[in-house]
Amino acid sequence: MDEQALLGLNPNADSDFRQRALAYFEQLKISPDAWQVCAEALAQKTYSDDHVKFFCFQVLEHQVKYKYSELSTAQQQLIRETLLSWLQAQMQNPQPEKTFIRNKAAQVFALLFVTEYLTKWPKFFFDILSVVDLNPRGVDLYLRILMAIDSELVDRDVVHTSEASGLENTLIKDTMREQCIPNLVESWYQILHNYQYTNSEVLCQCLEVVGAYVSWIDLSLIANDRFINMLLGHMSVEVLREEACDCLFEIVNKGMDPVDKMKLVESLCQVLQTAGFFSIDQEEDLDFVARFSKLVNGMGQSLIVSWTKLIKNGAVKNAQEALEAIETKVPLMLQLLVHEDDDISSNIIGFCYDYLHILKQLPVLSDQQKANVEAIMLAVMKKLTYDEEYNFENEGEDEAMFVEYRKQLKLLLDRLAQVSPELVLASVRRVFSATLQNWQTTRFMEVEVAVRLLYMLAEALPVSHGAHFSGDVSKASALQDMMRTLVTSGVSSYQHTSVTLEFFETVVRYEKFFTVEPQHIPCVLMAFLDHRGLWHSSAKVRSRTAYLFSRFVKSLNKQMNPYIEEILNRIQDLLALSPPENGYQSLLSSDDQLFIYETAGALIVNSEYPAENKQALMKDLLTPLMERFKVLLEKLMMAQDEERQASLADSLNHAVGFASRTSKAFSNKQTVKQCGCSQVYLDCLQTFLPALSCPLQKDVLRSGVRTFLHRMIICLEEEVLPFIPSASEHMLKDCEAKDLQEFIPLINQITAKFKMQVSPFLQQMFMPLLHAIFEVLLRPAEDNDQSAALEKQMLRRSYFAFLQTVTGSGMSEVIANQGAENVEQVLVTIIQGAVDYPDPIAQKTCFIILSKLVELWGGKDGPVGFADFVYKHIVPACFLAPLKQTFDLADAQTVLALSECAVTLKTIHLKRGPECVQYLQQEYLPSLQVAPEIIQEFCQALQQPDAKVFKNYLKVFFQRAKP
């Protein structure tokens, strides 16, 4: 072997040596006999370096995995012998191999097993066991090999490459069950028995193996007195009990007859209870309690599955026994649910949830069951509470886990509300009222959870459209009382961000309360508009409040009229466009400011003011933005530093975004025109459009202005049209693929909306736009530049979408009036799009365009020469495209393209009649060497009045035609 290259295997080697080692590995993988050198090195213990040994196993692994079938029988025998002699040598080694080497060896054994067990090596396990006997090192390797085999055969995390490998794995398992599983199980029993006092590591490994295999072997081999008693014995040994717990969990989880499962679980529980495992509070080892909690959860859920099956089968007596068995586990479940360790509590939630599901199905609940429901409710309320360690300013992994845990508890609360809505409402009301009575002297986490529970009731007790304050009188009045307490108690002043946020979340969730008791709106508005909300010291609170305030105002727009000017005055400072200089930190981020602008726009538009007042208020809102925009644009034109340019461009873009966001409140009932605001937005357009001619930061500025234009086309309608030509001219200068791709939807929007009104403009800019597109598409790019290829593909799609919009909007004369040469160029590109590019989305669009053009121009009075074009180009395209190898009829998008291809052929037949059939019969299809009877069949299908019949036929036609 190349000793120099092997030096690079050491993790501390320099990069040149490491590169050489990698290259050597690739070389050995390709070489037909290099593996033999590695096999020999392993068998003869040539190398003592661990990394070299690992390397040798890697080479062998590659050989077995990818090239085994190429080896001769003698070579395959050599690999078997090498591995067995290596295994034999491990018995005598003074020191065991490193774990990573043992694991890699086990993987190679497992790969060889999967390859050879059914054919050449049926005695695989007997050979291994005869080598390892009861030698602890041998047993360790035997167990690792078993785990590696389980991974290959059944591990859910391993993606098996094909259906064939899945079937082969099933066959291997079936054969193992018949031939060797009882012997393997016996070997596990012997290992567990012989090593129980001497080698805890081997015992843990063995328990892991039993847990893994129990899912697919005959359960009676494990679930018997001999085995279970031994496992229960291990539960009392500190170093073994976690693995024993997991092993029992796998046994309990195994599917089996419901009555047998019930008996198994009950016998386990009896022994565990007698041994004192149910006394959770005595146990200090939290890792073990977490595993035990998972086991109890498994036992509980197994009993519930048994109960469900028995009820379904009508076995009433057995079902009753199962229910009693479940009930006896509830006290233990509750102990685990309220455990201070959230992992332990989380592990039992599944059982708890399913238990409540049973109670929901029972016609009446016993007193004990009602008490259980109440106990679960108390547990949920307790466990929802934050602990002292929760870091609100810098939330890390622990905090994220608690948030997830809270989501699980929320599901429990929702399920509780399905079982007993009255209890849930009464419990929350009790806790809420008691806490808010003394909120000033109560710890933040208790105040937060009290408000949080009120918030959660909205989903736990669902109603349509948030109508919590009508309908059921007792529920409505309870919620009304709590909301009244929330907004009048002063708790919004609590000095903790979690309480503040929960307050605002809750008032917004129950916004309908303020339509019932509108007298509370001013005090809530004040909370939003002072140091408790938008001026809070915490950026997190300010940010969330900006969004919630917007929702609050919009949902109560009918109640807002008396407060509009006061609100607009108070938010004035928050509307300022943050100057991108001097490291100035504004109160809100630009994203948060979007919500404030949206709120301001909504207040003005939805107000009961006359149009002139609305116009004046909107002008006051947007004029400072326009003035600031002009100043910043001038600064950008003069800025030298690129970072400064980028920051100014961002600010300009924000200004455009803010103006755009104010227009969100307009609707069909409240149009810009009706509100008298057209001129303000036209002024904005005039202010923003000069940014398009700025040579700096083009991408950012164009993107912002383009988005604003999209919005104004909707809001201002034809009033926007005078601005479009010059805007388009600027946007077509110095274009990249992405610019064009984003510009075309703007033109599509104008075309689809205004149709004939924009015909002169479209005719004028049609060829300049096409030239810009073609110029970008024809630019050379590196063969392997995937992003450039993707950009071109997207631009091509946009181009065809544009042509589709033009033809689909009844504006085909825009194309027809471009002169014969240009028209032909456009038509050729559509044919190319339909045939030459393997992009089914573009192909579908091209066939839609072709159908439309045939419909418009394909009759007797169509443009001169178009009928020839139909027969020379469009008809062939309908055959050449689907015949291409890249046209995959198993792909959904491609099938849609074929469907449009069928429509095109049907349209040609509709417009040209018998002439089209004659052309297909006598000229075109014979030129493709189609058999006469198939030609006849094709033409008959084409002439069917039902288009669907032809679409289905066409798919079959091409499936037959393709090799």
From Swiss-Prot:
Pfam family, one: IBN_N
UniProt-listed SUPFAM superfamilies: ARM repeat
GO biological process, one term: tRNA re-export from nucleus
Highest taxon in the source lineage: Eukaryota
Residues where N-acetylmethionine is found: M1
MF annotations from Gene Ontology: small GTPase binding; tRNA binding
GO cellular component labels: cytosol; nuclear pore; nucleoplasm
UniProt keyword terms in alphabetical order: Acetylation, Cytoplasm, Nucleus, RNA-binding, Transport, tRNA-binding
Residues modified as N6-acetyllysine: K635
Subcellular location: Nucleus; Cytoplasm
Disulfide bonds: none
Main subcellular localisation: nucleus
Functional note: Mediates the nuclear export of aminoacylated tRNAs. In the nucleus binds to tRNA and to the GTPase Ran in its active GTP-bound form. Docking of this trimeric complex to the nuclear pore complex (NPC) is mediated through binding to nucleoporins. Upon transit of a nuclear export complex into the cytoplasm, disassembling of the complex and hydrolysis of Ran-GTP to Ran-GDP (induced by RANBP1 and RANGAP1, respectively) cause release of the tRNA from the export receptor. XPOT then return to the nuclear compartment and mediate another round of transport.
Subunit structure: Found in a complex with XPOT, Ran and tRNA. Probably found in a complex with nucleoporins. Interacts with Ran and tRNA in a GTP-dependent manner.
Entry similarity comment: Belongs to the exportin family.
Name by which UniProt lists this protein: Exportin-T
Native species: Mus musculus
Name of the gene this protein is made from: Xpot
